[in-house]
Regions:
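Cytosolic regulatory regions of ion transport systems
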Residues: 1-121
Length: 121
């Protein structure tokens, strides 16, 4: 399965490393190159420096062929924008958005975006 992950923080890097280890085709995006140091040694996926809310960056990451999209940065607004682009612009069938404010979950659900947050994990 082809996966794009936006955000190479603790959660994003951990998920990218695990999915790549399981044999999935993983592309992880982050605006800060140093964030990729969190990836497991020998990470077999692709790490791209870029903004996950930029359609040209998502295009370069292969969003048109992607099956799963995870927006896992530390910012709720950035995550929802990236998730909406994944769903609406690229038609990615499975989109998950990390949020820090659980009050936003209902709003995002009306947009067809599934969410996770720390308080529910």
């Amino acid at each position: 399965m082809r996966v794009i992950i936006v955000g190479s923080g603790r959660v994003g890097a951990g998920m990218a490393s695990q999915l790549a280890e399981e044999g999935h085709e993983v592309v992880i995006l982050d605006t800060r190159t140093e964030s990729f140091r969190r990836l497991a040694p020998g990470f077999s996926g692709q790490a791209l420096r870029g903004d996950g809310t930029d359609t040209s960056v998502l295009e370069r990451a292969g969003a048109r062929e992607c099956e799963w999209f995870f927006a896992l940065t530390n910012g709720d607004n950035r995550n929802i924008l990236a998730a909406q682009l994944a769903r609406e612009h690229f038609g990615i069938p499975h989109v998950l958005c990390k949020i820090n404010d659980p009050v936003r979950a209902k709003t995002y659900a009306t947009l067809g975006i599934d969410t996770i947050n720390r308080t529910e994990m």
